[in-house]
């Protein structure tokens, strides 16, 4: 049994029991995002969970936009969410908008009023909060709690017609102001908001609250298993109360699981919006963002995200996942599929003084050292090449096996070269290193005369492509997003992005946005879709080549 299957057993067992007992003939799950922002990796976990359960049990999974708050929602987010779900590899059975149920919700609210289970309240938001009480003190009843059914029906109809100002009245459920569950203390189910809605326009000026709308939406669609995160566990009795008292024909079951927390990662939509609004990142799809759009632009594949979400499974208690686990799955995917190339991101010119001027040759370098069937590619080699600046040191420490005066290394797929001279500018900065090569040491010839301890990569200075390389580190310094109560903006890593100008071998000349490469010794890179143009090739580093992380 896989980790994913084992971890998600408690939800699967519920579904299996329901099917075996004939409680349900089939299952219907749903992914119900609010279209007020871009989806992030936490939403991806919910998408994978719901759609995979639907697939496993031959059921259906709907995509429903929980669009009951007109002031925060936008069609832009609707379209981005649809794109993200498709990109992750899923097709919904039905597409719904909660706003399409507003008429039905209004009828159910009228039913509650007629049953004496709801009333119009004139308390201010501050007074409602004060009257609600605390976890240790019961609430106080609103002075408007015992209005007659007739008066409540009249006031609610006038609320709908737009006769009252925003915030002047609300419709509340009439339950129990002394309940130990604060959610039962006469929760608000409708508020006034004179705002245009992205889907219904100006038809409505009253809008249902989440706790009222969500169970009705599930019941209307015939959802069998309404899977949500743990913060809604205390809301489940209220969820069930609304389904029962609104006399819904279908009775969905709410099941809670732990939300996803990842080290060095902000998961709050409000905080992510703050990062965008304050210009700390360059948008919702910034490659440092944990949004699906950001991960896609960074270079993560749908398969890697799905495998990550399956591997972490579903738990009943909150925990934090190491961000290196997500990196593990993109490495696992790309090491099989990404073409190899050599690139120098911080170039230093190396001149081979005994190589014939004006000449070049074609070398063959393996595409994947672990897969002979991947074949080889042609790379040109000439008198001048670029190497990484960090691959040369004038005064190296012990056990430094790369290039330094008097030392010999192999240029990957080419020859041994020995450093003989260092050229500097007026500031003492190394600008060139002059070497000699040994023609007998060509790779692939079987030369065994002597060995070198270092192999470094390079690109032909006379046949390479200028490129920009964007190197990313975690955006948040602390492992825990809320470490010691510090404001999360204090934990922003000032070095989360480093931009380097370098060169890549000509095999990348036809690279298109979202193409992925393994760059020798550097890691896996993705061609940036936003900044790449015909004359400006930009690579985002997805992950480094190796990690100490071990999948348990």
From Swiss-Prot:
InterPro entries: aa-tRNA-synth_I_CS, Gln-tRNA-synth, Gln/Glu-tRNA_Ligase, Gln_tRNA_ligase_bac, Glu/Gln-tRNA-synth, Glu/Gln-tRNA-synth_Ib_cat-dom, Glu/Gln-tRNA-synth_Ib_codon-bd, Glu_tRNA_lig_a-bdl
Enzyme class at the top of the EC tree: ligase
Swiss-Prot/TrEMBL keywords: Aminoacyl-tRNA synthetase, ATP-binding, Cytoplasm, Ligase, Nucleotide-binding, Protein biosynthesis
Residues reported to bind ATP: 34-36, 40-46, 229, 259-260, 267-269
Organism for this UniProt entry: Clostridium perfringens (strain 13 / Type A)
Gene (UniProt): glnS
Gene Ontology terms: biological process: glutaminyl-tRNA aminoacylation; glutamyl-tRNA aminoacylation
GO cellular component: cytosol
Residues given in the record as L-glutamine binding sites: 66, 210
Sequence motif 'KMSKS' region, residues: 266-270
Renumbered ranges of motif 'HIGH' region: 33-43
Pfam families xref list: tRNA-synt_1c, tRNA-synt_1c_C, tRNA-synt_1c_C2
Complex formation: Monomer.
EC number(s) on file: 6.1.1.18
UniProt subcellular location: Cytoplasm
Single GO term (MF): glutamine-tRNA ligase activity
Enzymatic reactions: tRNA(Gln) + L-glutamine + ATP = L-glutaminyl-tRNA(Gln) + AMP + diphosphate
PANTHER family: GLUTAMATE--TRNA LIGASE, GLUTAMINE-TRNA LIGASE
Name of the protein in its database record: Glutamine--tRNA ligase
CDD domains referenced in this protein's UniProt entry, alphabetically: GlnRS_core
